[in-house]
Structure formats: C-alpha cells, structure tokens
C-alpha cells in the first residue's frame, strides 16, 4: 500500500463588488464555465458560486452593483480572503462614482487588512483605460491599509481570464 500525498485543497473566498454593468456576473460565469455570454441579467442581491482551480476551492460572492445593493457590500466583504472590485475600464463617465464607492467600502473598520484586487474589465473596448490610468483614476496609491493589486481583463478574452485565475491560485498558495 502506498500513501498518497496530502493534496488538501486550499480555499479562497472572494467578494466581487463594483458598479452595475461592470462585468461581475460575466466574470463569475467565465471563471466557472470558460464561456462568455452577452445575455446577462443584473444581479439582484447576490449569487454565490464555487469553482475549483488547480486544487484551490474558490467561493465567489457576486454582489449586485445597483445603488440599492451597495449598502450590503461591506457585510459580504467581512472575513473574505480578498475583495475583488470590478471596474468597467471603458466607462469613464462613471469612474468617479466607482472610485467613491470603492473608497467608502474600504473605509469600513471591519474590512481593514483584507487584500484588494481591482480588475479593470472590458479592455477589449476601444477607449478603455490603461492599467496606469485606472490605478490613478481609482486612487489606488492612497490605499495603504491593505495589499492592493490591479489587473486588466476582458471577460471575452480567455487569455486574460486564465492569467487572472493563475494569479488567484498563486496568491492563494502563497498565503496558505
């Protein structure tokens, strides 16, 4: 009889927040199924989905982005492995609102120290901001109470989604 190595899965719990139409639900679906769909309906309240990538079990909380749901973001961001803030990098008209909502969320004492991953989504759209411009517009350099990372993705581009999931898996393994 040979002993199998203990390949106990690592676990990650992520809350995906951001303004409505930033691509949170599309992102969850692409990470879970590998397929993108144009036919998304706005999330009412929240949805939760579990996926496993490279022996890492990831629980994704997809939170509604409409103004009436933003008051619940903080509650679902407590005690998670990471807050994932999704921004439509092509929607420059709403960046100031997105920045304000992000900084309001991060000002909650219950969330101090929880790592932040900002995802600039929809980079396939002409006029989408660069990583540097998004970092500046979102005021990420002023966020000092936690680890902060910014990645640029398109839910329509499997390569960027693979890079994101690789980053999440590696981040999970480096923390455990």
From Swiss-Prot:
Domain of life: Eukaryota
SMART domains xrefs: ARF, RAB, RAS, SAR
GO MF term set: GTP binding; GTPase activity
SUPFAM superfamilies assigned: P-loop containing nucleoside triphosphate hydrolases
Keyword Protein biosynthesis: no
Record-listed GTP binding positions: 21-26, 40-43, 62-66, 121-124
Subcellular location field: Late endosome membrane; Lysosome membrane; Cytoplasm, Cytoskeleton, Spindle
Assigned GO CC terms: late endosome membrane; lysosomal membrane; spindle
Any Gene Ontology biological process: defense response to virus
Main location, first listed in the record: membrane
Key words, A-Z: Cell cycle, Cell division, Chromosome partition, Cytoplasm, Cytoskeleton, Endosome, GTP-binding, Lysosome, Membrane, Mitosis, Nucleotide-binding
PANTHER family (UniProt xref): ADP-RIBOSYLATION FACTOR-LIKE PROTEIN 8, ADP-RIBOSYLATION FACTOR-LIKE PROTEIN 8A-RELATED
Function summary: May play a role in lysosome motility. May play a role in chromosome segregation.
Family to which this protein belongs: Belongs to the small GTPase superfamily. Arf family.
Subunit: Interacts with tubulin.
Protein's name according to its UniProt entry: ADP-ribosylation factor-like protein 8d
Organism: Arabidopsis thaliana
């Amino acid at each position: 009889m040979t002993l199998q190595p203990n390949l106990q899965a690592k676990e990650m719990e992520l809350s995906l927040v951001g303004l409505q139409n930033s691509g949170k639900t599309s992102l969850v679906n692409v990470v879970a199924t590998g397929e993108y769909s144009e036919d998304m309906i706005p999330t009412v309240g929240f949805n939760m989905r579990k996926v496993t990538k490279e022996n890492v079990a990831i629980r994704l909380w997809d939170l509604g982005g409409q103004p009436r749901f933003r008051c619940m973001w903080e509650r679902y961001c407590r005690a998670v492995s990471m807050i994932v803030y999704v921004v439509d990098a092509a929607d420059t008209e709403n960046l100031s609102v997105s920045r304000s909502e992000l900084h309001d969320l991060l000002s909650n004492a219950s969330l101090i120290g929880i790592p932040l991953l900002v995802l600039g989504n929809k980079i396939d759209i002409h006029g989408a901001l660069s990583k540097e411009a998004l970092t500046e517009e979102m005021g990420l350099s002023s966020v000092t109470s936690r680890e902060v990372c910014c990645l640029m993705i398109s839910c329509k581009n499997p390569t960027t989604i693979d890079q994101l999931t690789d980053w999440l898996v590696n981040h999970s393994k480096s923390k455990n």
